[in-house]
Structures are given as C-alpha cells and as structure tokens.
Amino acid sequence: MTTAARPTFDPARGGSGRGEKDLSALSKQYSSRDLPGHTKLKYRETGQGTSDENRNRDFRKELEEREREARSGTGATSSSSGKALPSIVRKAIEANNAGGGSSAAKRSKPDAGQQQAQQAAQQQAANMDADEPLDNDSSDSDSDSDDDDAALLAELQKIKQERLQETARRESEKKQEDERIRMENILSGNPLMNYEPGTAASAAGRASGLGGDLKIKRRWDDDVVFKNCARSAPDKKTHFVNDALRSDFHKKFMDKYIK
C-alpha cells in the first residue's frame, strides 16, 4: 500500500548538512557586476577649471598678454613659453632656433655657380632664332597622322550612319509585321465571320485553326444529352373531378388491384 498520501509528522530540518551550521543566516550570491567598482572618492585638482579657480583668474589680463605676444612676434612667444620650461630644455630650443635661422639664411643665398649657369641658359634661349625652320620629318609625320585621324573619323561617322539606317529599317519592318498580324487576328478572331464555307473569312478561320464550317449555336445547352426527353411522350389531358370514386387515380387503383 502506498504511503504517498500520509501526512509528514517529522519533516526534514536544515542545519545538518555541510555549511548549514547557522540556520538564521541566509544564503547570499553576488555577481561580479554587482560588486562596488569605485571605492575611492575623487577630488578636484588644479587646472580643471573649477569655479574657485575661475573666480581668482584675471581673464582680461591674460587676454592682453596673449595679444601683446601675438603682436610682438614669435620671439616673445618662445620666451614666454620658455619661462615655464627647465633651463636645459630652454637652451636646447634656443640653439635649435638659432641654427634653423642661420640655415634658412644660407639657403636663401644661392650659389654663384648656379647663378652663372642660370644666366647662361637664359642668354642661350634669348639668342635662339624664332624663325628657324623646324624639322621636316617631324612636320611630315604630323601631317600624316592628321590625315589618318581624319580618315578614321570619316570611317567612324560612316559606320554610325549605316547602323542608324539599319536600325530604322528593322523598326519599320517590325511595325509592318505587327500590323499584318493584327489584321489577321481581327479577320480570324471573330467566329461569326467565318462560319460560312467558301468565303475569305472561312479561309482565315481555317488558317487560324478555328475551322471554316463552324456552326453557330443559339443556346449553350443545345447539345446536352437529357434535353427535352419527354418531348415524344403523349400529352395527357388532366381534368379535375370533385368525386373520389370517379377520379383517375381511383380508376387506376381499381383496375390494378381489384379486377
């Protein structure tokens, strides 16, 4: 007999398993994303543009100094920026600026030999005779190339014209063929025009596959099987008699079952 329906008088109690010494303590489970990430408070530092710093700054004076440095040139700017740099770095920058200025000055003065060569080339170009005839071979080759180009252009234009004419001819032939097919469809598409044999309409109908001896039907149900089945049956004259003994049904019944 099953004991599944019996009440549990002694239920299972926790605390006897592993890690279940304190029954009052609830189990906890944390995710790595739930752990605190910022455990230190961040403070404002100098140079971040706080309200106290902006209150103590003299923006007018700073603007005037920047304008004065811009008007004075790069020297004042480099000197003002060099105040905040260490002495070694400042000396290196000044030496670099001095070397760059001297090298630029040296580059600005061209060599005497180069100047003489340039002057000689200019003099030779000026002494050249502008009326000196060019090479005959080069002129002949240029004229021949021009003639060849003209011939090629003429041939290309001729080919284009021929292609245009061919396209126009094909389009006209296609239009004529479409018109002929349309007229044939008009003549042979109507069955009322080709039901009589020996006519042009019947010939067109035979050519189109409709047949020249097509018979026109007056109704759609003329060729059904069970149409007018009782047409040949004799007509029965029905008459009404207000007497059950002299009615047709009573007479047939008496003739069939009594006689």
UniProtKB/Swiss-Prot annotation:
Residues 72-82, 114-126 have a biased composition (Low complexity). Residues 52-71, 157-182 have a biased composition (Basic and acidic residues). Residues 129-150 have a biased composition (Acidic residues). One of its GO terms (molecular function) is RNA binding. The lineage of its organism: Eukaryota, Metazoa, Ecdysozoa, Arthropoda, Hexapoda. Involved in pre-mRNA splicing. GO terms for cellular component: catalytic step 2 spliceosome; nucleus; precatalytic spliceosome. Signal peptide: none annotated. It comes from Drosophila melanogaster (Fruit fly). Residues 1-182 are annotated as: Disordered. InterPro entries: Cwf_Cwc_15. It holds the Pfam family Cwf_Cwc_15. This is Protein CWC15 homolog. Keywords: Coiled coil, mRNA processing, mRNA splicing. Belongs to the CWC15 family. Residues 150-182 form a coiled coil. One of its GO terms (biological process) is mRNA splicing, via spliceosome.
